[in-house]
């Protein structure tokens, strides 16, 4: 029987390397996808909390207006304002939820929302002091006028800050989800192509070995 000194078969070595590369690709793409999906989930949670905060702020703005319309009979509406702002600003409230979900990258925008909400709450307190002190026209001017220190201006700053924070989180959500989709596409195609190439290389290697012993 004819002997050969060939020890390493290039085809089989190539097939082995391709299989290992396919495995590494699959593991890497899976980990990357999991990370991106986790990020997308967090940004989605932050967006939801900020959406809820914006809705609560709009309801509080309506409560503020109703108090002025009631002229002395708006205790219920003012309590509604306080309850809604507490839901936004209070411990474990919507801004805390959004901040925890967004992480350090979204902290600045959410801190700006918090500062604006505190500013509006202070402006509302001044509006109530004007109304309770018999200065109803001044209270109305604060609610609907253009004074930068008034309640309307403070509310608009808050609404703008909420809009910026929401846009930031939605954009981050889209980026993370898009990256996850791309990774899944690569996960489906890459290892499959490498496996086919490995099979072809293995077949070529076996054919060489068969000829050697033929």
Question: Can you say where each PLM-predicted feature lies in the sequence?
Answer:
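N-terminal extracytoplasmic segments of bacterial inner-membrane proteins
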Residues: 38-75, 115-132
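Polar/charged, Q/E/K-enriched amphipathic alpha-helical segments with strong coiled-coil propensity
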Residues: 102-159, 174-177
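Polytopic transmembrane helical bundles with strong interfacial aromatic enrichment
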Residues: 20, 24, 125, 157, ...
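Alpha-helical segments in soluble extracytoplasmic regions
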Residues: 63-118
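Juxtamembrane interface at the cytosolic side of transmembrane helices
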Residues: 1-18, 192-214
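N-terminal membrane-insertion alpha helix
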Residues: 25-43
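N-terminal membrane-entry
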Residues: 179-197
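Juxtamembrane amphipathic/hinge helix adjacent to a transmembrane helix
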Residues: 1, 156-179
């Amino acid at each position: 029987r004819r002997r050969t000194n060939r020890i390493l078969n290039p085809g089989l070595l190539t097939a082995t390397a391709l299989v290992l590369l396919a495995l590494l690709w699959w593991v890497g793409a899976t980990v990357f996808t999991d990370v991106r999906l986790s990020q997308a989930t967090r940004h989605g949670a932050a967006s939801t909390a900020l959406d809820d905060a914006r809705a609560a702020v709009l309801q509080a703005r309506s409560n503020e207006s109703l108090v002025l319309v009631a002229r002395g009979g708006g205790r219920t509406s003012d309590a509604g304002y306080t309850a809604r702002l507490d839901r936004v600003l209070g411990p474990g409230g919507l801004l805390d939820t959004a901040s925890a979900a967004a992480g350090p990258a979204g902290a600045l925008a959410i801190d700006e929302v918090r500062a604006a909400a505190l500013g509006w709450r202070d402006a509302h307190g001044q509006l109530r002091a004007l109304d309770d002190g018999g200065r109803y026209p001044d209270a109305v001017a604060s609610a609907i006028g253009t004074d930068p220190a008034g309640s309307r201006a403070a509310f608009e700053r808050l609404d703008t800050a909420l809009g910026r924070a929401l846009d930031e989180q939605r954009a981050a959500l889209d980026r993370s989800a898009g990256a996850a989709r791309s990774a899944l596409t690569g996960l489906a195609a890459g290892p499959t192509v490498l496996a086919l190439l490995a099979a072809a290389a293995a077949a070529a290697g076996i054919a060489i070995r068969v000829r050697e012993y033929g």
